[in-house]
Amino acid sequence: MNTNIIQKVQTYLGAQALYKDSTTTNNLFAGRNLPSFVKDFLLKKYAQGEEIDRAGLTGFLNKVMPTGDLRSQLIMGQDITLLTRFSVNIDLVHNVRRFGIPDLGIKEREGQIPEYVASKHPELVDGEIWGIIKMCLMPDDDGKKSHVEMVDFKPFKPYTSVDVSFVQNVRKNFTTSEWLDLIISSMEYEPDSFETMHQKLEFITRLLIFVEPRLNVVELAPKGTGKSYVFNNISKYGWLVSGGKVTRAKLFYDRAKDQSGILKNHDFCAFDEIQTIVFQEPAELQGALKSYLEQGKATIGDKEFTSECGLMLMGNIPLTEDRKPVNKRYFDALPDNFRESALLDRFHCFIEGWYLPRINKSMIYKGWTMNIEYFSEIMHTLRVQNVYAELFDKLVDYDRQAGVREFTAVKRIATAYMKLLFPHWISANDVNLEEFDMYCLQPAIHRRGIIQQQCHYIDPEYKAEMPAIWVKER
């Protein structure tokens, strides 16, 4: 990244600027499975310019992420304080709020959250959470067995709120190319390692689902292009499903447990290596997905499930020697359960992952950039900013015969690009129409057009061509 951008980062981002050098800091986190948004928070906490207070950071990690056999320490009666990722499950049958820590092998049936802790923290609901917990071993009510009890909890939320206007003002000082490089560097990649602007735009398109509610995306790419990393490391508001079994109950609502599923409390849910995931009761799941992808709600028994969570399907696709898909029918790479036009037509956006480079060590960024934990909070906050969708309506005209799904898809994708690349556009007068067309509208039409074409291959009843959608003249 060039020195001009770095100077702007230091000048305009202020406290949200962070110096990254994983070659010297990764060993500080060795043996601790931490996502980037946690690492950036800790590095910022102990940063002194380009240097890190290594002793202070190590001491903090030893305190809240102790090593050793923690289960044995619990059995010996020790209290343990831990910064960790844990899951919460409300057991209505036994009237108990349970938690588990997958990284430590503590199962949900072994952990309990008492009412005095739960009542102070409404976020302790079904799902996965990052936070600092204090726990100890306590006897069950009957005295015959014991359980791990959470006696205190502090959510991992360094930013209780973020001011979007700050980022909007910062963005005014960067060109579009510079802002794009800043986003990529905050994701820990060296912008100069991407060969073209097209590659960079393809890469950051993965972030659209972070900023736009109920955006449904498909990405097919070769292995090694960093799909898992983006969705597992940048934001605590997403959920990554990697392998295993998926049911309607797990995604939407479990009637037996009266418990909401993954989609309820997350900004997005990404299926990684979708070819390896087993979808049980596929007919039930497919029916719920069709309804949810279309309307943001699904009926499970007598329960209506609603959410703003977006869905991401990620899979591998075979390529030729010149890195083009072997088969023009891209969706043949998906599992049978997802290879139905009526379901796929409800997805908005397609990412052509074969244009992305294979990730290697030379692509890891070193230098000043934006703190990714801060940027993830900005993206989360942008989801509820309606000004960009209103701008789209003012800027765009379209063929009145356009289908609702096609137009909705283009609007959501273009709106997401505005939030990500042009957050400072808050009135029509702010908008550069040429850039809007180039970076927002045309990519949106193209990405929805791929969905359209692929559905046509499956079922010729679906039109292959996109309707006319264009920028209004001023």
PLM feature spans:
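C-terminal, active-site-flanking charged/polar segments
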Residues: 312, 333-348
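Short secondary-structure capping micro-motifs at structural edges
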Residues: 205-206, 299, 333-338, 361-364, ...
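Conserved P-loop NTPase catalytic core
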Residues: 318-337, 359-369
